[in-house]
Every structure is written in structure tokens, then in C-alpha cells.
Amino acid sequence: MTGVASRRLHDPFVGPELDGTRWRFLEYPLADRTWVCREEGAETRVANGELTVRVARFRNAHPWHQNVDNCKHLLLASDTLPVAPTGRTTFGAEIRAESLGATPFDYRDGFVSFNVLDFDTGMVFDVCATSDRVFAIYERLPLPHVTDPFTYIVDAPLTGIAIAPGRWYACGVSFDPVARSAEWTVDGRRLFSAYDVRVPAAVTLGVGFITLHPVRDGRSHSLHGQGLAGGWRNVGVEYPVR
């Protein structure tokens, strides 16, 4: 009898409200307060297996904390999900994006993200989209306990992925602990592979809106009236056959 991979859905997105037992907003403790990565004007809808969020105009910004300035509106799964010690574990979601008032082809103005995060090591494995781009992020966050942070944006223009505003993309981030590798895919096509990776034992999934303009001269440069609309569905994990 042939084994079948085990697929687990994190949230069926039944609605009508977002399930607060499954999701929480990313928070950063600052000297004067706890910063919640949530756009107060966000229009959120949960129904028919989909989460949709629309922010007509970003408002969140920070003058010196780069991570806080980046994360405009970011939800994290309440529980971590383990990575199987052998075989290939794939974390996946379908995402769609429509940029609102953004500079064409400039992902820094804001993108829809599917995040696969390891907060123990600061490692980030994301698949992201705007109206006109789809790309991978490979990153080590500049957390207090992390050395040598980096951020790489990987655009693979020859993959042949059809890109259009509001189009659904099937995204995957796969880990193979034995091979020490990670792979990012969209619609079954490989965006990027990384090797000699410290594969996490468990990850936190996230969904949200992120900008990537550098903070400089004591102020944020991430706001110029732009916004973003996005959607997520089928957020979950597929474990290897046992």
C-alpha cells in the first residue's frame, strides 16, 4: 500500500471573524510601549475559506526601528508547527495581491507575504507578491540574540509564472533536514533553493503586509499614500509519507 503525505490546514477561515485562538498580531516591545503590527484602518473579511485584508493607505511607521517600520500588518499563527526530522516538509498557502497607489514594480512599497519563521534563530523563509511581482525572501532578522543578519530578495524572471493583480498563487516553502536544504516554489515552479541551511525544528507561520524601505536620517521613508489588498487561503503544512 502506497503511503500518502499528511496535509494539515492551519485555519479553514470559516468566519465571520478571524479566529483569535489561531492568530495573533506580531508585537515588538519598545522602551515606551508595545508596538502592535496592525493597521487600524484595515478592512478584514473571513469567509468561504479565505482571509482578505485591504488597507487603502498605510499609516504605521517608525523613525528608527527597521523591523517595526517594515511590518505594517502581520498576523502570526498562535502555535508553532514542527518540521519532520527526515523527508520533505512543505509549508504552503495560496496568496493574492493588489497594490494600491504603489510605485510599479517596486516591491519595497508593500507586498503580501506568506511567512515561515524561526524566531529561535531569526531565520525567515517567505513567499511574497505585489500586483506585478512574485518573489522569495531569505532572511536572518536582526534580533538581539542573532549575529550576521541579512535580507535577500530573490526574483526568478524566467520561471514563466503568470503574474497579474489579484491572481491566486500557490506558494510553498519546503525543508529537508537531512539534505540541509530549503526550497521556495510558486505554482509548482522553483523560485529559489538554499543549501547548508540550519533547518528549523519548528516554525511559526505568518500572513500580512510588509514594506522594505530603509529607515534613515531619523525618520521612516515607507509611506507615500500607498496601500495594499491581499488574500490568503489553504494555509497549512504537508508532512512526508511515513
Per-range role (PLM):
Residues 27, 32-146:
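Secretory/extracellular carbohydrate-interaction modules
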Residues 3-16, 55-63, 85-106, 144-147, ...:
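Ligand-recognition surfaces built from glycine- and aromatic
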Residues 128-130, 174-178:
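Short beta-strand micro-motifs enriched in acidic
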Residues 13, 167-175, 182-184:
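Short tryptophan-centered beta-strand motifs in secreted/extracellular beta-sheet-rich domains
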Residues 144-174:
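Short, aromatic/His-centered strand-loop micro-motif at the edge of beta-sheets
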Residues 1-38:
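Extracellular carbohydrate-recognition regions
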